[in-house]
């Protein structure tokens, strides 16, 4: 899958979806995802940071004027956001799956009330979430995100890695 919005397209005409998918697949080998457009995307996309079972912060990404992508590499702008009860419900629902698969750090992308992406290798933007920490519902008394990540990486995990499948 791409990153930074590479390969992401908006196709309004249903008769052109197959052609758009074929073009993406030619340019990027590997899995391709096709999903319906969420009208809530017009309000932005939240990146919520999840560390070892806990939400530790987040921020909102808004599109550049006239753009389709929320990605910061494509002109999107970060803003402070509130971590809502709906966001917490989504994160709680995905948490068992993340833990079962040995994932301890994730950037969860949410549009409206839908989880649209789970970034586990390098969930970018922690510094934005850190800078907006006092503005969201996490509060100024919460431990900084980077400190929580470091603490999680340097302590005994509360979860087990999945067992490898024998080949």
Q: What positions do the PLM features span?
A:
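Glycine-rich beta-alpha junction loops
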Residues: 1-3, 38-41, 62-63, 112-114, ...
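Phosphate-binding site of ATP-dependent enzymes
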Residues: 6-90, 94-98
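Short, basic, helix/turn surface patches
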Residues: 1-5, 27, 137
């Amino acid at each position: 899958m791409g990153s930074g919005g590479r390969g992401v397209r908006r196709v309004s005409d249903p008769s052109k979806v197959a052609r758009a998918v074929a073009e993406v697949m030619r340019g990027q080998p590997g899995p391709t995802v096709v999903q319906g457009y969420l009208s809530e995307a017009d309000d932005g996309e939240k990146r919520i940071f999840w560390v070892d079972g806990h939400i530790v912060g987040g921020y909102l990404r808004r599109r550049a004027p006239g753009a389709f992508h929320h990605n910061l590499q494509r002109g999107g702008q970060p803003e402070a956001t509130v971590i809502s009860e709906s966001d917490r419900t989504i994160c709680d629902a995905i948490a068992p799956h993340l833990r079962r698969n040995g994932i301890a750090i994730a950037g969860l992308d949410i549009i409206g009330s839908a989880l649209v992406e789970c970034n586990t290798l390098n969930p970018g933007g922690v510094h934005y979430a850190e800078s907006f920490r006092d503005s969201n519902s996490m509060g100024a008394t919460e431990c900084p995100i980077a400190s929580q990540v470091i603490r999680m990486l340097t302590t005994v995990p509360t979860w087990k890695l999945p067992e490898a499948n024998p080949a």
